[in-house]
Amino acid sequence: MEQTLDIKANKVKETVGRHVLADGFDFVMDIEKSHGSWLYDKQTDREYLDMFSMFASASVGYNHPYLVERSEWLGKMAVNKPTLADVYSEEYAHFLEVFERVVIPEELQYAFFIEGGTLGVENAMKACFDWKTRKNFEKGLQTEAGICIHFKQAFHGRSGYTLSLTNTSDPRKYQYFPMFNWPRILNPKLKFPITEDNLEETIKNENLALVQIEEAILMNPDKVACIIIEPIQAEGGDNHFRDEFLLGLRRICDDNEILLIFDEVQTGIGITGKMWAFQHFTAKPDIISFGKKAQVCGVLANKEKFDQIPNNVFRESSRINSTFGGNFIDMLRFQLVMEVIEKENLVENARVVGDFLLESLKALAEKYPEKISNARGRGLMCAVDLPSAAQRNHLMNELFNDGLIILPCGDQSL
């Protein structure tokens, strides 16, 4: 039976705001009329071109025909919410088959699912803390390893362990909450275009960052379990790193029996022109976190590396777990999304269209060098800098008024 909605569009924010902070976008989304990359505003009967994609989580836009075609099945599945860690079904097994075929990289065969990208990151960290601590015990050391090295301008989440990592330009997201004082390292981000001077500055910062990491390890013997980095720092400013730097991280991890985490919550599932952003690089992680475009969140880990500890968290019951073991309906939605990605070759499409977008942004930067700079990107994950935060915000508001939704990042980037 079709549900009748008796709340008018002009009363939506008022109704929501009675109990929830309703200070988001100034439109009311029409769920049924939104389509592709277009959001439909029920208040004004106006369409907005969506270039924020629900904070990088809308994998194939809105009301994709294939998902709409399967909506009756998806709705039927949504009636129940099984606890997947202990209760299994044919539908769950089929999701995992598609997930394995389309998404899981050869080097990361262990999987763990949970609700929320932050918890994906946190459980990646827990897996590393456990692994390194047990490594210490094997050597006769009684030292528990509970330190995670991370980088400036990182965003890894808003709760638990991740609060000790997040340090982007908006302090409201982490200030006054209790945190661990873990080593925070200079992020040697690239500046574009990559001129001789810019590259020299980047290499100098890379060397400094690697020295800072080695010093942190020396000051905390056997206590550092992991290094975590976003392959592209998203909210921190769409900051890119050289393969040479990531290889430096890989070397330090290998030399010190430390695990390397790549946080792929925002960079994963094709947006960079590869399924995972780390696949652009020679350096490989031991474990990644995922979420957003994957609908369900979690981690993928290197089985060979973690199996150096026989009772690692992926083999010992209840070391990492949650009631629902992910989210059943999110998994099934993502199953359909993966089938669309596969059938329509959308990862390659992101690479091709992303190349066009980046070249267009570079052309704008050349045409208006006093207004736009530092054009950068991989695939469709692109950004530019404005001269100041105020000018960035003004442009963002003007674009919204013209019917385009885009997000800020870093201090002055779009």
Locations of the language-model features?
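Conserved N-terminal phosphate-binding loop of PLP-dependent enzymes in the Aspartate aminotransferase
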Residues: 1-414
